[in-house]
Amino acid sequence: MFKPIIPTIFRILIGFVFLFSSITKLISIDVFEVYIYGFEWLSLNASYIFARLIIGFELVLGLLFISNIYFRLSWLVSMFTLAGFTIFLSYLLFIGNNDNCNCFGDIIQLNPLNSIFKNLLFIILLILSFRNKSGTFKFRKIIFISLIIIGLAIPNIVSPPDNFLQYDRKIETKFDIDKFNTSLNNFVDVPESFLTIKKQNKVICFVSSQCNFCKLAVKKIEVIAKKAESNDNILLVFFGEPENINSFLDETNTKEFNHIILSVPDFFEQSTGKIPEILLLDKGNVIKRYGYRDIVEKDILSFLSSEIDI
C-alpha cells in the first residue's frame, strides 16, 4: 500500500538536498568563488559568474524536484551532473587535492573522497526515485520557465557579483615609503624584495593572520601572481604576534611570498586599518589601492608584467 509513495519521498528528499547544497554555497559564496578561481581555468570575473551559475543550477533542480515538474528531464540532468562531478572529484583525488570541495560550501567540509561517496549515495536515491511520475497540471511550461528564471536570479540578487558593483576607487592610503623603510630598520633580516621597493613594481598586502577576508584576498593575489609568474614582487605585511602566520601562509598557499610582521603602531601608521588593504607600488609610489571586493585581476596582471600603465 505504501510502495507508490516511496519514489515520491525520495524525489522530495533529493530536491531538498539540492536546495541545501545551493544555499550552503550561497551563504559562503566568497569561499566558493575563490575555490573556483584557484583552478586557474577562469578569470576572476568569470569565476564570480560561474559560481552563481552553479548555485542557481542546483537551486533550479531542487525546485523542480520538489514541485514535480518535468521529473524525467530533471532526473536525467541530475544523473549526468552527478556523473560529471564524480569524474571531476576523482581527478582531484588522483592529483592529491584533499581540500574541501565546496559541495556544501564552507558550512559542511568534505574532501573529494567524502564527496564521491556522497554522490554515489545521491545516485542511489535518484535510482530509487525513478518510478515517480511527473505532475500533470495547468501552466506547467510557464511554471517551469519561471522556476528557472527565479533559481538563476536569486544568487545574483542575494549576492551580486563583485564585478557588477561600483566601488569608490579613490586612492586613500597612509602609506609612506620613507616611513616604511624606517620601520624596516628594526629588522635584522629583511627580505631582499622589501629593500627594492623603490626600484621595482610591487604589490604590498596589509593583512591580519586571523582575518578570513584577508585570507581570501591573498588567495586571489596568489593566483594572479602565479599567472604573472611574479611571486617575488608580492609582499605580505602582518601585524601583531607571529603565532598564526604559518597557518595563514599554509592555508593561502603563499609560503613563497616574502613577508614581515610590523608592530601594531607601525602597521596602522602605514595602512588605513581597513584590511585587507592591497597597494600597487610603482617605485614606492601608490598608484592603486584595493580592498577585498574591488580587486581587478587584469590591472594587477598588467602591473606585475609591466605591459601597460594602469
What is each stretch, according to the model?
Residues P4-L26, Y48-F88:
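Functionalized membrane-embedded alpha-helices
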